[in-house]
Amino acid sequence: MTLSKNENIKAKQKQINLPKILRQEIKENNKIIKWFYNIVMLLGGIGFLIVGISSYIGNNLIYFLDASEIIFFPQGITMCFYGTCGILFSINQISIILNGVGEGYNEFNKELNLMTIYRKGKQGKNSDINITYSLKDIEGIRIEIKNEYFNVKQNVFLRIKDKNDLPIIQLSNPIKISDLEKQASEIASFLNVPIKGY
């Protein structure tokens, strides 16, 4: 069976109109919840530290945080320690959220025959992750679902020729399996490669 001239033209136009670039933005989930927990932790840490210092100087730095019945050693010094840890940890986590650490994109560019995986790192030199491969090296897509007690991990990997599988989607908060399959099939369809099991 041969195509008519008009059908050939339409087929070529369809190929020309096909997207040449697939880009998936990777964003942090549950930012509002993380903001809430870290602000609560920060305020709690400040409260502990103030009570610990108040027990040391024998005077309440803030009137509603009563430290009159707390002995500096061992209770006060312990509260100072936990308060300092809470403050430092929450500030670090807030900094990670503000700077978008772990966010980035997956880009598949047929024009350049190039795949780019970019993730933002912490502030500092060479902390960002920027991985590139030729599209020809991609052999397939692999979906992985792990049930570890109460923790469900959902991952999508690229199977790279002569290399370890490369994670491109990593979800600590589970989504519907159909949604995960949809994301994986979008990449597989664009690259024309197979999807392999769970």
Swiss-Prot record:
Signal peptide: none annotated. InterPro entries: PSI_Ycf4_assembly. Its main location: plastid. GO terms for cellular component: chloroplast thylakoid membrane; photosystem I. It is a multi-pass membrane protein. It is found in: Plastid, Chloroplast thylakoid membrane. Keywords: Chloroplast, Membrane, Photosynthesis, Plastid, Thylakoid, Transmembrane, Transmembrane helix. It holds the Pfam family Ycf4. The chain crosses the membrane at residues 35-57, 70-92. The keyword Magnesium does not apply. The keyword Plastid applies. GO terms for biological process: photosynthesis. Belongs to the Ycf4 family. Seems to be required for the assembly of the photosystem I complex. This is Photosystem I assembly protein Ycf4. It comes from Euglena gracilis. The gene is ycf4.
